[in-house]
Amino acid sequence: MYVEAVRWQRSAASRDVLADYDEQAVTVAPRKREAAGVRAVMVSLQRGMQQMGALRTAAALARLNQRNGFDCPGCAWPEEPGGRKLAEFCENGAKAVAEEATKRTVTAEFFARHSVAELSAKPEYWLSQQGRLAHPMVLRPGDDHYRPISWDAAYQLIAEQLNGLDSPDRAVFYTSGRTSNEAAFCYQLLVRSFGTNNLPDCSNMCHESSGAALTDSIGIGKGSVTIGDVEHADLIVIAGQNPGTNHPRMLSVLGKAKANGAKIIAVNPLPEAGLIRFKDPQKVNGVVGHGIPIADEFVQIRLGGDMALFAGLGRLLLEAEERVPGSVVDRSFVDNHCAGFDGYRRRTLQVGLDTVMDATGIELAQLQRVAAMLMASQRTVICWAMGLTQHAHAVATIGEVTNVLLLRGMIGKPGAGVCPVRGHSNVQGDRTMGIWEKMPEQFLAALDREFGITSPRAHGFDTVAAIRAMRDGRVSVFMGMGGNFASATPDTAVTEAALRRCALTVQVSTKLNRSHLVHGATALILPTLGRTDRDTRNGRKQLVSVEDSMSMVHLSRGSLHPPSDQVRSEVQIICQLARALFGPGHPVPWERFADDYDTIRDAIAAVVPGCDDYNHKVRVPDGFQLPHPPRDAREFRTSTGKANFAVNPLQWVPVPPGRLVLQTLRSHDQYNTTIYGLDDRYRGVKGGRRVVFINPADIETFGLTAGDRVDLVSEWTDGQGGLQERRAKDFLVVAYSTPVGNAAAYYPETNPLVPLDHTAAQSNTPVSKAIIVRLEPTA
């Protein structure tokens, strides 16, 4: 049986969960070449038993992703339509549930035992393992311990701070992708009623680049495919995505596609286990057999080389079309539905294949094989995630990906399309509900008509802009609706200093995290219900809704007893805060919203495009799919009225002499900033997180050996002639299969290396996949 390296137990004296470990004791074994299997089942059950006990584990997992159950608080991969399997979850989904539904609690007594300074010295993993937050807490100026506060007093404190600001724009309101549609709608309504569009959210740090690129290309920032499209594609390209860890249920769909004859191309710097082979634990060959091979072609690309890859593929496709006109380019689609083809053709035929080889690190023969697979496919889906979105040229890269699909007419046809795979379970739904600093006029006008308010029109702060504003003293109140802002964001030292400049920080949270310890002069922790928790108002069970990565909207029903009677739902927190902030005469019916979420959904139906008759449609089994004009009717709501070919100068990430290009990534025991454990089973790491994966040739070149400990020092030219350096200390060197000149390490440990101002053009997403670093021996 799989055994964790960490030692955790509950202290008899303090009742704290010790969660002790020693980073120096980390061990490294060969990487795995298959994902899931029986071991994934064993780990799922082990984590459930540790956190929830047998009965609660059985009750929770039986309802996870079921039609009458709750949506997984992990990733945004969709449920398959129709009947559900008995176990409709993956290993990391089970871990997410175990973390949220744990029987451990963090009470007021816990905060009495531990000062903020003491807790600040604990690692993120230790903090999370203490359990669910059970009481609202306040830290006042001069105090060194959080102390209990009543809910009414907490609301009044926030309202007084907000109403005392000289401008609503001196407050920012952050959102995590866990927040439900109902809570997100109410939250943005509160914020716009207050008078600002300062609505940064977690999407700013991940798929903002996808939204920007797709909006330019096809007129909508969402993917165009369904589960059925993926299952019936001829060819699936998976670029910059690690489904085995980040979206494991996707592997089942890929398995079905393979059974239907699909070919799969994986494009990634690391040979991740889930890209190589999948052992489905619900099938015989996944238990006693060898499972299913995933990638027919593995393209081990250099970091930042994806734009060059797809530009090179575009050139080969265009050259094949010129040799045999009508054989490659879908002329009917391009002529009738696209703009900018001639400019794209001229630019792409000038792309040098030698340059493509240098930028990608692959051989011409492999590029030709991939091009041949694209030409042979009549139904192509291209999927991607952070490996494409977190580069300076991310928007241009995704435009290049879309160009290849447009050439072949692969938008708005069955079995084909774009598939940005979202990370957090409702991050796409939050945007649909209005969580964005620059919502379009159509949405704002509808909001104003429905509620009789006047929404501000000036764009607000995204995540990076919000940090800059706090840093510069232009924002003095920060409120986080979920998430772990201090650990999720770049440039840790700058971000933490920015938060500490605030007069008030408010965190609406399920569990203890670093953001509770990096605080303003006054700080509040407001404990909230999670997806798994039963939400009852006036004796009536409340339901919430979420939107997955493929625009399917469905209900989620928590069923477990909450951790305490002092925990409130996000909707209730928002609505009661609004009552304290605006008083009883406000035109928005906050009390009615707090008591009956159906009334919120009625308001959503009146405001949000595609959500008409929301209360009825969301109650249909499997829910409903939001409109997507390119998918539904080959209608492109762009500036040209057509799908636009993107034409950009070719960009990639050269490796400076004596340096490496570092990407930050998750371990298999991690979901965003939530650390489930200290092992990365697929990559062979056990018992620690401060490791850096480096090609053996680079290890030799730098005069190192595997097992050495080094500091990572990032170097960034700030555009004003200055060279900025940042340091992350004490990483174990691990020899690994990664392109020469490239390296990888886990976040949030490496977030201190990411400059706040090094962001993607157009999307302003931090560049976390192309950090220039040098290695120095740890002192």
UniProtKB/Swiss-Prot annotation:
Keyword match Iron-sulfur? yes
Record keywords: 4Fe-4S, Iron, Iron-sulfur, Metal-binding, Molybdenum, Oxidoreductase
Enzyme class label: oxidoreductase
- In terms of superkingdom, the source organism counts as Bacteria
Claim: GTP-binding is one of the keywords in the record: no
InterPro entries found in the cross-reference section? Asp_de-COase-like_dom_sf, MopB_CT_YdeP, MoPterin_dinucl-bd_dom, Mopterin_OxRdtase, Mopterin_OxRdtse_a_bac, Prok_molybdopt-oxidoreductase, YdeP_MopB
What are the binding positions for [4Fe-4S] cluster in this chain?
C72, C75
Pfam hit, one: Molydop_binding
Q: Which GO terms describe its cellular component?
A: membrane; plasma membrane
- What's one GO MF term for it? 4 iron, 4 sulfur cluster binding
Cofactor note, please? Binds 1 [4Fe-4S] cluster. Binds 1 molybdenum-bis(molybdopterin guanine dinucleotide) (Mo-bis-MGD) cofactor per subunit.
The cofactor required is: [4Fe-4S] cluster; Mo-bis(molybdopterin guanine dinucleotide)
The catalytic activity of this protein is classed by the Enzyme Commission as: 1.-.-.-
Task: Kindly give any further remark recorded in the entry.
Answer: Was identified as a high-confidence drug target.
* Similarity comment text for this entry: Belongs to the prokaryotic molybdopterin-containing oxidoreductase family.
Q: What name does the UniProt record give this protein?
A: Uncharacterized oxidoreductase Rv2900c
Organism (species): Mycobacterium tuberculosis (strain ATCC 25618 / H37Rv)
